[in-house]
Amino acid sequence: MKILFDQGVPVPLRASVAAEVSTCFEMDWSALSNGELLAQAESEFDGFVTTDKNLRYQQDLAERKIAIFVLPTTRWPLLKAYAVAIGAMKTGDYIEWALPDPTNSA
């Protein structure tokens, strides 16, 4: 699986993901709008990881084939837990995880 990290996704996460990972910066796609970025990413990647929680409201994702994973935070210690799920994404997935509620001890 080939995965693209959006701007804002901590690059150290790539070492924990069992997939080939590139970043928007490395691809020289930093200036693309969300719609252009998703179209370009879909032509070359299987998955897209972002921190943009508004993406699903800003873009029509219904026809997208690329898997999209929205991270709930950029805090590195919390992100390691998401590496397995990112590597296991399937075509067309849209996964948006929330952080666990720290007040809920159950």
Label every model-predicted segment.
Residues L32-A39, Q59, T74, D101-A106:
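Residues lining hydrophobic/aromatic ligand-binding pockets adjacent to catalytic sites
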